[in-house]
Amino acid sequence: WDVMLCVSGTAIACENALVVAIICYSPALRTPMFVLVGSLATADLLAGLGLILNFVFQYVIRSETVSLLTVGFLVASFAASVSSLLAITVDRYLSLYNALTYYSERTVLCIHTMLAGAKKLCLGLLPVLGWNCLRDRTACSVVRPLTKSNVTLLSTSFFLIFLIMLHLYIEICKIICRHAHQIALQQHFLTASHYVATKKGVSTLAIILGTFGASWLPFAIYCVVGDPEYPSVYTYATLLPATYNSMINPIIYAYRNQEIQRSMWMLFCGCFQFKVSFRSRSPSDV
């Protein structure tokens, strides 16, 4: 299981390092929307590196201090990844719901994102600062050396974020359907292309939220109901799918974007000149 987590971490690190490099390489991608995508890729990149370091320190350098640092690093990285997903969801919702005041509200969103990042950093430091079960084995959770209260706090935070994202994506779907209906009224009928576009948009949102929930919900639920006496295979079996979310994120939020695809080709094939001008997409684009 540790080898599988290490392999997963390597794949996550490689995928997201490429996204970060592409966004840093192309000036056309240095827009607020892509900054959020870049922050998500950076968090997932750090999570992948954390999985690799965890494997190395488990089998090469065994130390309680190093173990705590690695666990804290992983907690902060994955928490930052989930928070970045929430920030992207809020950004897309605001771009659709309040299009006229969107750019003024973006500043507030950026401030909240930075505050959330500071909070996740604090969550990662808690095990290092003493909130661990190294001295009291009875307080251990299914994720050693985190305590039961620690993982309960993390799981509760995840459930809250998941519910907020679920609510926002439902509202986004309503807005999409409402816009399609308004277009149909203006044109006196709903064309096949509008129907297909609406159906595709709703399906994509369902896939995004479904992937996120399927990846993290089993692990979050097991952290709450699991007992440290249970076989560790249960922990690994629920943790591994959670890491897959960081592997899927760059595919959903980056590689499917046409601007990033063009920048990727320019990064690898700098000799080619693209005549297509770069246009910053609306953050509501999925």
Predicted regions and their residues:
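Helix-to-loop junction signature of class
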Residues: L5, G9, L46-I61, F78, ...
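Helix-boundary and loop/linker segments of multi-pass membrane transporters
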Residues: Y25-R30, Y103-R106, V142-K148, A192-G201, ...
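Fourth transmembrane helix
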Residues: S77-A87, L94-S141, L160-E171
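Seventh transmembrane helix
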Residues: I164-M165, T211-V224, Y236-V286
